[in-house]
């Protein structure tokens, strides 16, 4: 009876016990249990698929049975059913490409600036909130390029302020990978490829950059400025600019906000 509750078919139980299928069915009838018809499912295979990240719906399609049948087999084998948010995290994590690429470098540049990567209760959230629609669309496009398929995008409306565009994805794998990065990764991985450096600078500038115009007498000075309070990031920025042959200068304001201005 325990084997049957766990999802094993009468035929499989007969093989395990070394008896005939009819004997198993007879014993089930004696216990007041009507044998299931038309299914010969392997609970261990179902459990393995589930633990490898497949959803109950995906497993049901593979096994050609109902979604509820898979859930029942998992519950009867003491397997906790994941919440939909947890399934979403696994789906995103399985398909994300974290190998160095222009899209990944751009994403890192953004996250080093306005973006955020945080753990919110049981969720691992990558998020960007900005008022520039083109910026948010570019960030979203690059997320899709590295494999994010389930992207939450919405607009926050305010009475006396500009609309705020928000893009949010969830990924436990990306969260822990991102938190493990240090300056060496930027210097030795991104910093050894011209296209990657340009992509990172683009993302960092989209987050932290601005065009400054100063007038002094008859002269007009125009330059690009990137401001950030993290000196390590400014050092990375300066290293990339130097490798790309772009002149720059660095100074620190009284409030310890570092700026990298370059022509």
UniProtKB/Swiss-Prot annotation:
InterPro entries reported for this sequence: Homeodomain-like_sf, Homing_endonucl, Intein_endonuc_central, LAGLIDADG_dom, Resolvase_HTH_dom
A GO MF label: DNA strand exchange activity
DOD-type homing endonuclease domain location: 107-246
UniProt-recorded name of the protein: Uncharacterized protein MJ0314
Source lineage: Archaea, Methanobacteriati, Methanobacteriota, Methanomada group, Methanococci
């Amino acid at each position: 009876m325990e084997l049957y509750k766990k999802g094993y078919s009468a035929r499989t139980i007969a093989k395990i016990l070394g008896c005939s299928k009819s004997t198993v069915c007879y014993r089930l009838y004696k216990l007041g249990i009507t044998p299931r018809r038309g299914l010969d499912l392997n609970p261990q295979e179902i459990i393995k698929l589930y633990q490898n990240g497949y959803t109950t719906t995906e497993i049901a399609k593979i096994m050609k049975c109902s979604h509820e049948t898979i859930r029942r087999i998992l519950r009867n084998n003491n397997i906790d059913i994941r919440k939909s948010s947890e399934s979403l995290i696994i789906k995103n994590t399985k398909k994300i490409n974290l190998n160095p690429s222009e899209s990944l470098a751009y994403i890192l540049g953004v996250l080093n600036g306005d973006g955020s990567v945080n753990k919110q209760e049981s969720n691992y959230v990558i998020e960007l909130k900005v008022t520039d629609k083109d910026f948010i669309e570019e960030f979203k496009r690059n997320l899709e390029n590295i494999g994010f398929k389930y992207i939450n995008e919405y607009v926050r409306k305010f009475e006396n302020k500009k609309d705020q565009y928000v893009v949010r994805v969830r990924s436990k794998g990306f969260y822990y990978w991102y938190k493990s990065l240090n300056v060496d990764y930027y210097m030795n991985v991104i910093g050894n490829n011209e296209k990657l450096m340009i992509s990172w600078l683009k993302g960092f500038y989209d987050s932290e950059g601005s065009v400054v115009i100063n007038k002094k007498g008859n002269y007009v000075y125009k330059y690009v400025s990137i401001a950030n309070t993290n000196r390590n990031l400014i050092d990375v920025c300066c290293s990339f600019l130097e490798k790309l042959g772009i002149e720059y200068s660095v100074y620190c304001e009284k409030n310890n906000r570092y700026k990298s201005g370059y022509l």
